[in-house]
Amino acid sequence: MRLFLSLPVLVVVLSIVLEGPAPAQGTPDVSSALDKLKEFGNTLEDKARELISRIKQNELSAKMREWFSETFQKVKEKLKIDS
């Protein structure tokens, strides 16, 4: 029974796929595709800049940078003394 029902469904799906795009769905012109790509790039850039600024302004990241700087200075001083 399943095979009996699935074969007509398969034929309908294949006919729709093989029919091709409708005239209104024809290939879009290159300029609109480039405009969409440019818009996507701009929004991605804006989001990345916002994320970086949020990370820089975050209190935890500021404390981590400060701790890393202090630790690095201590290591540098120890290496200068030992050398």
Swiss-Prot record:
* Location(s) in or outside the cell: Secreted
Molecular-function GO term, any one? fatty acid binding
Keyword Cell cycle annotated: no
Q: Output the GO biological process annotations, alphabetical, semicolon-separated.
A: lipid transport; lipoprotein metabolic process; negative regulation of cholesterol transport; negative regulation of lipid catabolic process; negative regulation of very-low-density lipoprotein particle clearance; triglyceride metabolic process; very-low-density lipoprotein particle clearance
Q: Extract the signal peptide range.
A: 1-26
Keywords per UniProt: Lipid transport, Secreted, Signal, Transport
Q: In its keyword annotation, does this UniProt entry include Transport?
A: yes
| A GO CC term attached to the entry | high-density lipoprotein particle
Q: Which family does it belong to?
A: Belongs to the apolipoprotein C1 family.
Q: What does this protein do?
A: Inhibitor of lipoprotein binding to the low density lipoprotein (LDL) receptor, LDL receptor-related protein, and very low density lipoprotein (VLDL) receptor. Associates with high density lipoproteins (HDL) and the triacylglycerol-rich lipoproteins in the plasma and makes up about 10% of the protein of the VLDL and 2% of that of HDL. Appears to interfere directly with fatty acid uptake and is also the major plasma inhibitor of cholesteryl ester transfer protein (CETP). Binds free fatty acids and reduces their intracellular esterification.
Q: Recite the other comments.
A: Apolipoprotein C-I is present in acidic (APOC1A) and basic (APOC1B) forms in P.paniscus, P.abelii and P.troglodytes and perhaps also in baboons and macaques. The two genes for ApoC-I arose through a duplication process that occurred after the divergence of New World monkeys from the human lineage. In human, the acidic form has become a pseudogene sometime between the divergence of bonobos and chimpanzees from the human lineage and the appearance of the Denisovans. Pseudogenization resulted when the codon for the penultimate amino acid in the signal sequence was changed to a stop codon.
Protein name as annotated:
Apolipoprotein C-I, basic form
What species is given as this protein's source?
Pan troglodytes (Chimpanzee)
Gene behind this protein: APOC1B
